């Protein structure tokens, strides 16, 4: 039985992305915006979807998300509640009574988390009490603002400390290169350290890549964050498809992430998606029908990535593809063979990829919903460009001492700026680790130092196994 997953959405970005995610899940499971089943007449039909992973269900066929919503100002959560009246458990919604926000400052959000930590953890404990086979968390947030970064960081630390045997995954949005938040490099470097230290798997997005992709795939040329957030929701839905529409493989978060994370430090994943069928993104441009062969190869195109990539020849450590639609297994086999010739894998990594054939929702059909679509999570050394940009932007303003006064009242900075320097050092360590992972003897060196992988003491998975390929 697939375990339950609790979603925690923090700050404006986290709650706006969460709104799109829950809308997508509701459509895929035939649930209305008020939580009522849209198909009560099908009560005698055995459902093939597992709503229990993300929803509680009462005796009146009403569904409530396993979700907690946090923010320090009311607008984003208010919008969620207006769009989904009565959908969320009101006891799982927290808006700061002061409603002042975090002023785009990491330390304000982090200190608020320290102040309210007992109350926050009590909310989480109660939600866990309503599960029967709790599997883990997914945190949705931005790394650049004040609440998503600061409060999100505090919650990450608390979750990994209290529930260290459970999976803690994140969907983390990085900012555009051009931003009006002057302390963005500080917020990002402090948050990235917590993603390194306290997350088991982090799926990264950046707004520049998202905006470019949105402009390409939508008919409407006026892109908005609601549209880019729907792209993120499409990835989140696809990652969990095999949990919610269970298959005999990849039906848990550990089974997915253990294929992607070779060592604890290297747990950052770059998502790609193509094509966007109308059951994922309403208003997507028309496109020709593609085979699974075409889709798998197109997922490697950097224009379909949701993280900006600075190289055309990335080195891959591990790859997981989730396909939906009318897939021919012969096309999958041909694509796997082609990637072995075309894609550069780390020397110690088998030149294969994991492919999961998921199922489309019977409740969310559209004109092209039987078309093949694909989502890829890639663990690749090209992800270091995100970290290098973070470090570079931090160095520029930190060396000038610019805007440090915004952090001087933070509890962590009462005795100086060591936390900034330590965070930079931790991030540089991961950059070095990814670069080292391109070498043939990398895994031998790691195994000599530490045999632990995702989930604690799990052994390295043999990803060459035919049973693991399709």
Swiss-Prot record:
Q: Which CDD domains match?
A: gamma_tubulin
Molecular function terms in GO for this entry? GTP binding; microtubule nucleator activity; structural constituent of cytoskeleton
Its localization reads:
Cytoplasm, Cytoskeleton, Microtubule organizing center, Spindle pole body
Instruction: List the PROSITE patterns hit by this protein, alphabetically.
Output: TUBULIN
Chief localization class?
cytoplasm
Which BP terms does GO give this entry?
A: cytoplasmic microtubule organization; meiotic spindle organization; microtubule nucleation; microtubule nucleation by spindle pole body; mitotic cell cycle; mitotic sister chromatid segregation; mitotic spindle organization; positive regulation of cytoplasmic translation
Q: What InterPro entries does the record tag this protein with?
A: Gamma_tubulin, Tub_FtsZ_C, Tubulin, Tubulin/FtsZ-like_C, Tubulin/FtsZ_2-layer-sand-dom, Tubulin/FtsZ_GTPase_sf, Tubulin_C, Tubulin_CS
Q: Name one GO cellular component term.
A: inner plaque of spindle pole body
Q: Which residues form a coiled coil?
A: none
Q: Detail which positions bind GTP.
A: 144-150
Q: Which cysteines does the record link by disulfide bonds?
A: none
Annotated keywords: Cytoplasm, Cytoskeleton, GTP-binding, Microtubule, Nucleotide-binding
| One Pfam family from the record | Tubulin
What's this protein's family per the entry? Answer: Belongs to the tubulin family.
Q: What is the purpose of this protein?
A: Tubulin is the major constituent of microtubules. The gamma chain is found at microtubule organizing centers (MTOC) such as the spindle poles or the centrosome, suggesting that it is involved in the minus-end nucleation of microtubule assembly.
PANTHER family, alphabetized: TUBULIN
Protein's name in the database: Tubulin gamma chain
Q: Which organism is it from?
A: Eremothecium gossypii (strain ATCC 10895 / CBS 109.51 / FGSC 9923 / NRRL Y-1056) (Yeast)
Encoding gene per record: TUB4
């Amino acid at each position: 039985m697939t375990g339950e997953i609790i979603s925690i959405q923090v700050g404006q970005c986290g709650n706006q992305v969460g709104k799109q995610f829950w809308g997508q899940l509701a459509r895929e499971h035939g649930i209305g915006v008020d939580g009522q089943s849209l198909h009560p007449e099908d009560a005698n039909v055995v459902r093939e979807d597992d709503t229990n992973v993300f929803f509680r269900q009462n005796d009146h066929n009403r569904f409530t998300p396993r979700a907690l919503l946090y923010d320090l100002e009311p607008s984003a959560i208010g919008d969620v509640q207006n769009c989904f009246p009565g959908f969320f458990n009101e006891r799982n919604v927290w808006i700061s009574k002061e409603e002042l926000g975090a002023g785009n400052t990491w330390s304000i959000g982090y200190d608020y988390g320290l102040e309210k930590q007992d109350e926050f953890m009590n909310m989480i404990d109660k939600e866990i009490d309503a599960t029967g086979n709790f599997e883990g968390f997914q945190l949705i947030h931005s790394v650049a603002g004040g609440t998503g970064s600061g409060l999100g960081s505090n919650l990450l630390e608390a979750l990994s400390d209290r529930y260290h045997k459970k999976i803690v995954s994140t969907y983390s949005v990085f900012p555009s290169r051009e931003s009006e938040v002057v302390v963005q490099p500080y917020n990002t470097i402090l948050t990235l350290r917590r993603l390194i230290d306290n997350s088991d798997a982090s799926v990264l997005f950046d707004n520049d890549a998202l905006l470019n992709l949105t402009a390409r795939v939508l008919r409407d040329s006026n892109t908005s964050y609601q549209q880019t957030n729907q792209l993120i929701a499409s990835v989140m839905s696809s990652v969990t498809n095999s949990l919610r529409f269970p298959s005999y493989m990849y039906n848990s978060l550990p089974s997915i992430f253990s294929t992607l994370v070779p060592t604890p430090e290297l747990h950052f994943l770059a998502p790609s998606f193509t094509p966007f069928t109308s059951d994922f993104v309403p208003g997507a441009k028309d496109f020709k029908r593609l085979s699974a062969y075409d889709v798998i190869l197109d997922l490697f195109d950097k224009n379909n990535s949701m993280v900006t990539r600075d190289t055309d020849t990335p080195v891959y450590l591990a790859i997981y593809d989730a396909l939906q639609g009318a897939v021919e297994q012969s096309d999958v086999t041909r694509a796997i063979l082609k990637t072995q010739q075309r894609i550069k894998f780390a020397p110690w990594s088998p030149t294969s990829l994991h492919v999961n054939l998921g199922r489309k929702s019977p409740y969310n059909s559209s004109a092209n919903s039987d078309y093949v679509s694909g989502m890829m999570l890639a663990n690749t050394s090209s992800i270091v460009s995100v970290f290098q940009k973070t470090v570079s932007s931090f160095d520029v303003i930190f060396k000038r001492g610019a805007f440090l006064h915004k952090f001087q009242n933070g509890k962590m900075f009462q005795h100086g700026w060591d936390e900034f320097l330590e965070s930079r050092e931790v991030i540089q360590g991961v950059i070095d680790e990814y670069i080292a992972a391109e070498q043939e003897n990398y895994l031998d060196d790691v195994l000599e130092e530490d045999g632990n992988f995702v989930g604690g003491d799990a052994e390295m998975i043999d990803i060459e196994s035919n049973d693991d390929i399709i």
